[in-house]
From Swiss-Prot:
InterPro entries, per database record: HMG_box_dom, HMG_box_dom_sf, HMGB
Assembly notes: Weakly associates with the stable SPT16-POB3 heterodimer to form the FACT complex.
Primary residence: nucleus
Molecular function GO labels: DNA binding
One term under GO cellular component: chromosome
Location of the region described as Disordered in the Swiss-Prot/TrEMBL record: 1-22, 64-92
Keyword Cytoplasm: no
DNA-binding region: 19-87
Designated name of the protein: Non-histone chromosomal protein 6
Length: 92
Protein backbone atom coordinates (compact mmCIF):
# COMPACT_ATOMS: atom_id res chain seq x y z
CA UNK A 1 0.00 0.00 0.00
CA UNK A 2 1.35 3.41 -0.96
CA UNK A 3 1.89 6.08 1.68
CA UNK A 4 -1.22 8.11 2.34
CA UNK A 5 -3.58 5.41 1.12
CA UNK A 6 -6.16 4.08 3.49
CA UNK A 7 -7.18 0.49 3.78
CA UNK A 8 -10.85 -0.06 3.05
CA UNK A 9 -12.67 -0.98 6.22
CA UNK A 10 -14.51 -4.24 6.15
CA UNK A 11 -17.13 -3.33 8.71
CA UNK A 12 -20.28 -5.35 8.64
CA UNK A 13 -23.29 -3.52 7.20
CA UNK A 14 -25.93 -2.64 9.78
CA UNK A 15 -29.18 -4.54 9.49
CA UNK A 16 -31.93 -2.03 8.63
CA UNK A 17 -34.36 -4.08 10.75
CA UNK A 18 -32.16 -3.76 13.85
CA UNK A 19 -33.66 -1.59 16.62
CA UNK A 20 -32.55 2.03 16.76
CA UNK A 21 -30.14 2.88 19.57
CA UNK A 22 -31.52 4.73 22.57
CA UNK A 23 -31.03 8.49 22.84
CA UNK A 24 -29.15 10.11 25.70
CA UNK A 25 -30.66 12.79 27.92
CA UNK A 26 -28.54 15.35 26.07
CA UNK A 27 -29.88 14.18 22.70
CA UNK A 28 -33.48 14.63 23.88
CA UNK A 29 -32.55 18.12 25.09
CA UNK A 30 -30.75 18.95 21.82
CA UNK A 31 -33.61 17.73 19.64
CA UNK A 32 -36.07 19.82 21.64
CA UNK A 33 -33.95 22.99 21.65
CA UNK A 34 -32.15 22.93 18.27
CA UNK A 35 -34.82 24.97 16.45
CA UNK A 36 -34.93 27.51 19.28
CA UNK A 37 -31.15 28.01 19.12
CA UNK A 38 -31.31 28.39 15.32
CA UNK A 39 -34.14 30.95 15.61
CA UNK A 40 -32.20 32.97 18.21
CA UNK A 41 -29.01 32.84 16.10
CA UNK A 42 -29.91 32.97 12.39
CA UNK A 43 -27.17 32.00 9.98
CA UNK A 44 -24.92 30.12 12.40
CA UNK A 45 -23.21 26.92 11.30
CA UNK A 46 -24.16 23.40 12.31
CA UNK A 47 -21.08 23.21 14.56
CA UNK A 48 -21.94 26.47 16.29
CA UNK A 49 -25.47 25.21 16.98
CA UNK A 50 -23.94 22.16 18.65
CA UNK A 51 -21.61 24.30 20.76
CA UNK A 52 -24.46 26.52 21.95
CA UNK A 53 -26.60 23.49 22.77
CA UNK A 54 -23.70 22.00 24.74
CA UNK A 55 -23.26 25.22 26.70
CA UNK A 56 -26.98 25.39 27.47
CA UNK A 57 -26.96 21.74 28.60
CA UNK A 58 -23.99 22.32 30.91
CA UNK A 59 -25.71 25.37 32.39
CA UNK A 60 -28.80 23.37 33.39
CA UNK A 61 -29.03 22.19 36.98
CA UNK A 62 -29.87 18.57 37.78
CA UNK A 63 -33.53 19.44 38.41
CA UNK A 64 -33.88 20.93 34.91
CA UNK A 65 -32.12 17.90 33.38
CA UNK A 66 -34.44 15.43 35.13
CA UNK A 67 -37.21 15.33 32.47
CA UNK A 68 -34.62 14.58 29.78
CA UNK A 69 -32.97 11.92 31.95
CA UNK A 70 -36.37 10.30 32.50
CA UNK A 71 -37.00 10.25 28.73
CA UNK A 72 -33.54 8.74 28.18
CA UNK A 73 -34.18 6.03 30.78
CA UNK A 74 -37.51 5.14 29.16
CA UNK A 75 -35.88 5.06 25.72
CA UNK A 76 -33.10 2.83 27.04
CA UNK A 77 -35.68 0.36 28.35
CA UNK A 78 -37.42 0.44 24.95
CA UNK A 79 -34.14 -0.25 23.19
CA UNK A 80 -33.20 -3.13 25.51
CA UNK A 81 -36.62 -4.72 24.96
CA UNK A 82 -36.47 -4.32 21.17
CA UNK A 83 -32.87 -5.56 21.11
CA UNK A 84 -33.82 -8.72 23.03
CA UNK A 85 -36.76 -9.37 20.69
CA UNK A 86 -34.53 -8.77 17.66
CA UNK A 87 -31.84 -11.14 18.96
CA UNK A 88 -34.43 -13.81 19.73
CA UNK A 89 -35.97 -13.48 16.26
CA UNK A 90 -32.61 -13.61 14.47
CA UNK A 91 -30.97 -16.39 16.50
CA UNK A 92 -33.42 -19.02 15.27
Amino acid sequence: MAPGERKKSSRKKKDPDAPKRSLSAYMFFANENRDIVRAENPGISFGQVGKLLGEKWKALNSEDKLPYENKAEADKKRYEKEKAEYAKKNSA
